[in-house]
Each structure stands twice: as C-alpha cells, then as structure tokens.
Amino acid sequence: MVKRIIKYVGLAVFFYLIYLAVCLLVPPLFHKTTDAAAREAFHTVKTDEEGFAKERARSVDTNLDALLWRLRLVEEAQESLVLTTFDFRDESGGQDMMAALWNAANRGVKVQILVDGINAGLFLSGSDNFRQLASHENVEARFYNPINFLTPWKINYRMHDKYLIADNWGYILGGRNTDNRFLGCYEEFYNEDRDILVYETVPGKGESLCQLQNYFERIWNLPDSRIFRKKGKGGNLVAHYQQLKQRYPEAFTPTDWELETTETNRIELCTNSIEPKNKEPWIWDRMIEEMKQASDVQVQTPYIISSKKMYQDLKAVTDSGVSTEILINAVENGTNPFGCTDYLNQKKKIRDAGVHIYEYLGKQAQHTKTVLADDRISIVGSCNFDMRSVYLDTELMLVIDSPEINAQLRKQIGQMKESCRHMHPDGALQDGSQYQIPPQEWQKKLIYSVLRVIIIPIRHLL
C-alpha cells in the first residue's frame, strides 16, 4: 500500500513538472503584434480646457544622486508617496528608503509600495524592517503577481517598473532598483544606470505625471497585485532615519526644484500593458517609430536578445539610412551571463541588422536603457533591448523632447565610447583610447561555453 502511494505521488510530481515546464516555456513563444488603437487608448489621459502644463526634468546618472533625489522627494511630500520597484532589498540602500518612507508615514503621508512578487518573496517578505514599515497605519504594500504554483502560466510575467511619485508635483523614473547595486555608494562593484527626475511647474497638470498616476492606479488595483499582510515591529527604522540625516544632510535641506531641472517641450509616458500575460510590443514599436524618423540614433542597453521581428525592425531602421549605434556591456564585464552568451551566439545577426555595436568595458557594468533620436528626443526608462522586456514584462519609458537633456546624454555616451570596442556592421573592430581587455578567468570561459548551448531553447524568456 505504501509503495503504491509513493508510486502515485511520484507520478503526480513527474506529470506536474512536465506541466510546469510547458507552462513556463510554451506560452511566451507566441509573440503578439501591436494594436495601435489599444495602445493609444491606454496611454490617453484627459485634461481640462487649459491643457497640460510644461514639465521640467533632469537626468540622474550616479547612484549617490539617485539616492539623494529619492530622499528629497520623500522628505518634501505632504500627502502621498508611491514607490514601485522590481527589486527591493533589506540592505543599506533599501533600508535608507524604508526609513525615509517610515518617517513620511509618521508625518501623515499616505505611502503605497508595489514590488514585483518574485523578488519580494525572495528578499523582502521576511525582512523585519519591511514588516515594520508595512505595519504602519499610513502604509500599504502589495506584491505584483507573486509565485503561485497553481497558476504556473503566470510566473514568467514580471513587473519591471521603477519609479517614485511625490504628491502631484514630482517623480523619478528609470532603470534603478531599490538596493545597494543602484542606490548610494555601498558596494565596490555596482551598476551604472539612469533615472529621470520630473518636476511639475503646475502641480497635477503635467502630461507624463497624469499618465504615470493613471498607470499606477490600474496596476495597483489588479487582482494580481496582492496585499502584503505580514506585520511586525522588530525593525530598526527609527534609529536608521536619524543615521540617514547625519550621513546625507544635503538631502534634508529645502530644494529649488525649478533651478535643479531643465525645461522640456514635452514628456510622454510609454508603457507595456499591465496584466501577467504575453504583451503587445507597445514600447518597442514606439521606440522603432522614433528611430525611423531620425537620421542619427544612439542606444544604451545592457545587452541585446532579439527576436526575428526585432532584428527585422532594426534592419528596417538602418536600411532607411539611419545611423544606428548601440552601446552594450562587453562580455568581459557584463553582469548578466545570459545576455553575454546570447551576444556571443548572435553577433552575426546583429551585424546583419546594420547597427554599429560598442562593447563597453568600463570600471562598472552599465544597466542603462536609453534611446537618443537626433538632437531632441531622449527615451529613458526600464526597457531593455531583449525579448523579456518587449513581450513579457511590464516596462516604462519616458519620451522626452528636450535638446538640452539630449545633448547631455549624447556627451555621456561619447565619453563612454572611449572605453568601448567598436564592432562595425562588416565585422571590423576598432578599440577606443581607454579600452583595455582584462584577463578572463578560465572558469568564466567554461561557464559561458556551456551556457551558449543551454540558452538556445530558452532565449525567448531572457
């Protein structure tokens, strides 16, 4: 009898694992195409007869500044704060944000926190500090699409958004998570990234802020955004906040937001859809539209993992005469082994698309997602040039019309190119003046050789 039970349990587990593998691998194979009308309807927000007011912005390009500007937003909020992030960890950078949010809640500010369910389950739900924060009467936390093995077909679809909204007068949005690799100066090795700080000249009247608030309300109220109910008082947020004020006094003085930002002609939010299912490539198609209208395009992305359609789109851009340069991490210092090994497998297809590749070998890996179209349009946010960002995850990008910001970002990319190897479409290589290849450990070479084979059947998930 016992043997029979063990046999049936074993068979049940075996068939469930097959079912799980099918749910994880098969649905993402079917890529959707964009319904332009649906995309437009999703992003449209109403305003009064006076129309939208101009918004001001600045690029935030160091991890220390990224932390400081977040703290300033939190400190000056009077009514509400919204923090949405893909990854939130109970380490120095994450604790800084928890302590600041705790203090804001003590002032009577309503705080809403939305975190992707996988990383929240792995790194956050057991945190005493986070449980203390979530226990505050003015704080509500939710996890987007937490893992549920009864609905395994949803597991692949993650929330990759990263933004912080203060009241109705300002927000910061970009590619940075809420942990030590992105906030503050807590790690020897970290990720370079970019956020955009947006300030409203007329509170509540900026187009992109209205779009972002509307987007947040939709995703916050999804049935898949589950309330975090575990409470606790064992954290150290009160003492940490006092330490925070001593460590970063510049974040706790009044800020002249207009002086610290640059005028823009327009800022528009572009998103993917929000439900945990296959996405139409709304952001990707919008970026391609902007690229096709330009004569010169500069792209920053950590890596490239393209579908057949994505290669075709890039080829259409370059065939129309648009000079297209893409800066990615060199394999030698990339922090994503799947992105690195796919690049080794796909180099010829990338060259055949007619783009110029710059392999960046700086002191740190870059995690930046930016598209510059000519000298006015800058597109910045969380969307990588990979199939996961294009077809599976929620993503956000800001389309910014500002010659000043565009010029600033072009200058930064130009400086980074000195630490790059330039691969031309014909395969010719040219090293920048500061490009130096470090010795690559044999263990890493071996791992990458194995991964180059392993990732082939699963690259549509990467």
Predicted regions and their residues:
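Lumenal/extracellular "mature" regions of secretory-pathway glycan-modifying transferases
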Residues: 142-144
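Charged, low-complexity intrinsically disordered terminal segments
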Residues: 2-140, 149-160, 166-462
